[in-house]
């Protein structure tokens, strides 16, 4: 193995995927939205950040934070923009925020190491500001609990479905990421001993593209194949608003993920 290959392997970090659930007071939604959008916009500028998305359902905000390694995640919490967000939103929340940790299934850990959120840059090297509300994308999170004995088969079938989704003829599927839940000792229970929890983070160009996806043959086939593998009925949350990114082009995959999709296909 060449020395360059060895260095590449050494540079691959364990990607940290965290979903943070924040619940705003009824009258604080607008302020929470602006503060969270500002924090996300600054967070994607961090060198070792892969994604920082923010979604809203009613008064619940879900932050999807993906960092390249534990050190990058720790450094994020020391950033002035994070500290300002933390201070500014504390009084807006109706209850303490909670977090969930995941490991990547698709794209892979290696792919996430080579991906950053794409930015729109002008000729002067400045980030182009996009008007809030100009995007049309819709997002949903699907939670699926799978019997442990079926996890390998479930992941294979689901990755095939994700790749087919990204290749849909109308190009309406902007993201189809698959994460596997990491439970802490406090979370462990008998159910978790017998099953694993997965989350599909799906983003579509608009509601029509989402409907088109649900009616595709590959989506219907996926449902039929995985139904016997599920420990309980799947659940999902359809978000009311994509808080960030405001520019739909920023949902795009980096080159590494596109290559992975082609190889897997």
Q: PLM features: what roles do these ranges have?
A:
Residues 125-165:
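Flexible, substrate/cofactor-facing loop regions flanked by secondary structure
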Residues 30-33, 50, 62, 68, ...:
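Long tandem-repeat architecture
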Residues 25-27, 104-105, 147-149, 207, ...:
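Generic structural motif
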